[in-house]
Amino acid sequence: MALRIAGERAVSDPHAGLDDLIADLRDESAPWDALSTGDDADADAVRTVFAWSYRALPEDAARLFRLLGLHPGPTFGPHAAAALAGAPPRRTRQLLDTLVGAHLLDQPASHRYEFHDLLRAYATAQARQDEPSEAREAAPRRVLDWYLHTADAAQEWLAPGGERLPLDPPDEAVTPVAFRDYDQAVDWSEREHANFLPAVRAAEAAGLVHHTWRLAAVLWHAQAPSASGADWLPVGEMGLRAARHLGDRPAEALLMERVGMGHARVGRLAESAECHREALAIREELGDREGVAESTNLRCVVALRGRLLAEAERRFTEAMAVFTELGRERPAGIARANLAVVRFQAGRLDEAEPDARAIEALHRERGDKAGLGNILRLISAIELETGRPEAALRTAAEAVEHELDLRDHTLEGYWLLALGAAQGAAGLPGDALVSFQRSAVLHRRLGNRGREALAWQGAGEVYAALGRDEEAAAFLRRAAAAHRELGDRWNEALALEALGGPGDRERALTLIAPDDDPRAAARRARLRAAGRRRRRRK
């Protein structure tokens, strides 16, 4: 890099002698000592070239270069750079071009910029040396303002209908991005994803506690739809610490709730349940009826995954009643959809389907593709169990089709489980294996081991139907082991039942012994009947 910059300077001034060039480099080396202990010749050469190139910049470009060293993340766009500088975006783009032309900044993609690590260190050192302390403190605040308000604008598209925080206006020199549509918001979120954690970390390190908790709260809904829940958890933990530091109990409950949702997204149900329990306790203490209903609903989602069906049904019913009383149609609809899932899991299909169809109509009316896809997944499962495999296939395929618009791998991976099951039942084993394989890959990347295990389980059942017993057993054993490790006794029992060995069936019966719903009773009867048939064959 140093040779490239020096060579370009030499070419741009062919009348300059080599001795003059070397003298200039040496003279400009004094201001920066970050790269060398003084006896490292290579580092010293790089340092002096950086200094020389920096000193050749116009003052406004040099100032931008310095301030960019204070950006918290690895890459940035012109709007974030403008916020750091407190300058108009159009002028900032011109200055960025100047820095790229001087090889002090790289441009890996259109409207994206990054430093070489050594240049970042140099820029940061120059900011410390040449910028007044007030300017060094104001620039990071401005860029954090920009992230907060742009993320807030993005979540309006990414989580329509969700609750938005009241925010103070940004610094007058900050121009947040406005989005025309969903895809623009997703594009921004995906580009900036790697900056979210560093931004919140920078806010925490600077003692900007209000920025810290608000950024964390807003970024839950503004994160890229296909982001891993594990990526957000450290963001949420920092926000939670900031809320506690402020003694802001509503903010603490909100962050606790979202940390719980993050744990659930990666299959950590015990941690999720504890977070929702704490959020519920705070909201009860505050007398926040809507918040209590929200925490109750989320707590019961975890109970549902743990198959505590009676408790989940009772609590979902309570939450739905509160939301309805408060005129909150969207969360009331979510609670009703969750009730339909409870009834399906209990084997009460005649109750589950009418609720699911009503929610489907509501989501279609509102144009809520995420909600629609989720309820279509449930309807597909109901159709499959009631002997309508072709209908189940069409329904699951529609759900996955909606994901293409949403660009959400979390939803795609989940809905592919329903599509794979329908494809297998409809006599399309090859297609089913493709769906389960992609679901497994997506869930592995997202860090959701429980759903990854469900994809293995689905593949194992397809292989079993094809008579490829060795491959079936390998997938099913792997799935059963993962479910056991995660404490998911119901799905472990299903995997063991599919394996079909006498020891497997006995273990499955033990696992589902606590369940008293119609589905569990029917499965126990099936397991016992299979055991009797096996004994008669002997």
Protein language model regions, located:
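Conserved positions within tetratricopeptide repeat
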Residues: 4, 93, 137, 141, ...
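Amphipathic alpha-helical segments of tetratricopeptide repeats
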Residues: 200, 240-241, 277-288, 318-327, ...
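Residue signature of alpha-solenoid helical repeat architecture, marking inter-repeat boundaries
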Residues: 190, 206, 210, 227-230, ...
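Inward-facing hydrophobic residues that define packing positions of alpha-helical scaffold repeats
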Residues: 7, 22, 96, 196, ...
